[in-house]
């Protein structure tokens, strides 16, 4: 079952991306480097 999740910037805290994941296959929180338009640089985004 796929669920929708938000990816939050770890530096400024803004919610920049909406994605989905399968909680049965990946129960841990997602952490991916993405571009933050507020900081105007690539930062680590974590699942919120």
Curated annotation (Swiss-Prot):
GO terms for molecular function: structural constituent of ribosome. Pfam families: Ribosomal_L33. InterPro entries: Ribosomal_bL33, Ribosomal_bL33_CS, Ribosomal_bL33_sf, Ribosomal_zn-bd. GO terms for cellular component: cytoplasm; ribonucleoprotein complex; ribosome. It comes from the Bacteria. GO terms for biological process: translation. Keywords: Ribonucleoprotein, Ribosomal protein. Belongs to the bacterial ribosomal protein bL33 family. This is Large ribosomal subunit protein bL33B. It comes from Streptococcus thermophilus (strain ATCC BAA-250 / LMG 18311). The gene is rpmG2.
